[in-house]
């Protein structure tokens, strides 16, 4: 359970964590769960997170993303990502595993490319909170990945955790700016 969460948030998110963010680990794999509080409506945050074809909107380290010409955002579709230089990766082919607009859940697997994240799977969920006429969002992102040969669990987790945390921080920055710029706090949505 991420330490960034309040007791109320933890209590409300318990079922979602059990359903979407808990993994059966094989020997040689590790997982982690991160939370990000965002001062923007969940509809706005979801409009950014759900765009499998535009991860660079909020994900650091992505130079470009391409999809097939007649791309339809549906489970099973793929994207090809080119990673910025300086990381232990060049390219990544990723498959959309889940996209549930009603429950605001999305997830993908890395299925190819030049990188060290073998069997990487990620799930992201977007949650609405309201208290004293304030609305905010908590985003949970978890992953499971095989540890590369020669790397410890701590090494693997440190690298993946850093990337996930930076992406969630950028998501908060982007969504909060969009909400502020809309004037009414509702934000516009990514199209």
Swiss-Prot record:
A motif (Latch loop) lies at residues 115-117. Changing residue 152 to L: Insensitivity to pyrabactin and impaired ABA-mediated binding to PP2Cs. Keywords: Abscisic acid signaling pathway, Cell membrane, Cytoplasm, Membrane, Nucleus, Phosphoprotein, Protein phosphatase inhibitor, Receptor, Vacuole. The keyword Phosphoprotein applies. The keyword Cell membrane applies. The modification Phosphothreonine is found at residue 78. SUPFAM superfamilies: Bet v1-like. Receptor for abscisic acid (ABA) required for ABA-mediated responses such as stomatal closure and germination inhibition. Inhibits the activity of group-A protein phosphatases type 2C (PP2Cs) when activated by ABA. Can be activated by both (-)-ABA and (+)-ABA. Promotes drought tolerance. Homodimer. Binds ABA on one subunit only. Interacts with HAB1, AHG3, ABI1 and ABI2 when complexed to ABA, and possibly with other PP2Cs. Binds to CARs protein in an ABA-independent manner, both at the plasma membrane and in the nucleus. Interacts directly with CAR1 and CAR4. Interacts with CARK1 in the cytosol. Interacts with AIP1 in an abscisic acid-dependent manner. Interacts with FREE1 (via N-terminus). Interacts with the E3 ubiquitin-protein ligase RSL1 at the plasma membrane. This is Abscisic acid receptor PYR1. It comes from Arabidopsis thaliana.
